[in-house]
């Protein structure tokens, strides 16, 4: 549990983050619909509240992997600057690291930096499915889960 920071202007565009033309309940509903469409397991077991660019995610009984994927999926929405993790996992597990993609990054380069081996990029790709559809489709500002080697 804790507060995770994201790049507010990067990510999936679900509403007009610049003019804020949606109320908080509408934003939370759009985020929940987005989560349900991703196919992340147990996405329907969380509750989301949005206030001033901060998403608070609550829930109980999720796996560590599902929890992290949900937090990353919520944080990688344009207009979300931080995610307050209030989700309780079913069993304690080691948390993954998070990595913010920079301009020019590739999964291979990130893998080399994190694991010391560029060929382990698929481990990062698999850890970020279904949010990532292809290992080549990452963008600056996107936050990725980096599982243990």
Swiss-Prot record:
GO cellular component, one term: cytoplasm
Induction text: Transcriptionally regulated by CpxR, which binds directly to the promoter region.
Record's keyword annotation contains Cytoplasm: yes
Keywords: Cytoplasm, Potassium
Family annotation (Gene3D superfamilies): LysM domain (3.10.350.10)
Segments traversing the membrane: none
Any GO molecular function: potassium ion binding
Domain LysM, residue spans: 97-146
Subcellular location: Cytoplasm
Keyword Cell inner membrane: no
Disulfide bonds: none
Domain BON, residue spans: 23-91
Gene deletion effect: Deletion mutant shows retarded growth at high concentrations of K(+). Deletion of the gene impacts the abundance of muropeptide species. The absence of YgaU leads to the activation of the Cpx pathway.
InterPro entries membership: Bact_Kbp, BON_dom, LysM_dom, LysM_dom_sf, Transpt-assoc_nodulatn_dom_bac
Chief localisation class: cytoplasm
GO biological process, one term: response to potassium ion
Record's function text: Highly specific potassium binding protein that is required for normal growth in the presence of high levels of external K(+). May act as a sensor of cytoplasmic K(+) concentration. Binds a single K(+) ion, which induces a large conformational change. Can also bind the larger alkali metal ions Rb(+) and Cs(+), and NH(4)(+). May be involved in the regulation of peptidoglycan cross-linking.
Domain comment quoted from the record: BON and LysM domains are both required for full K(+) binding. The major K(+) binding site is located in the BON domain and this initial complex is stabilized by interaction with the LysM domain.
Protein name per its UniProtKB record: Potassium binding protein Kbp
């Amino acid at each position: 549990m804790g507060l995770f920071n994201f790049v507010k202007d990067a990510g999936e565009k679900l509403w007009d983050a610049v003019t804020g033309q949606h109320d908080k309940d509408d934003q939370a509903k759009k985020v929940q619909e987005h989560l349900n469409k991703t196919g992340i397991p147990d996405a329907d077991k969380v509750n989301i509240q949005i206030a001033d660019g901060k998403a608070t995610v609550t829930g109980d009984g999720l796996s560590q992997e599902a929890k992290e994927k949900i937090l990353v999926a919520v944080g990688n929405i344009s207009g979300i600057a931080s995610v307050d993790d209030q989700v309780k996992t079913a069993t304690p597990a080691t948390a993954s690291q998070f990595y913010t993609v920079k301009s020019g990054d590739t999964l291979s380069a990130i893998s080399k930096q994190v694991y010391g081996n560029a060929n382990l990029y698929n481990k990062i790709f698999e850890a970020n499915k279904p949010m990532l559809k292809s290992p080549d489709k990452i963008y600056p500002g996107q936050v990725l889960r980096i599982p243990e080697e």
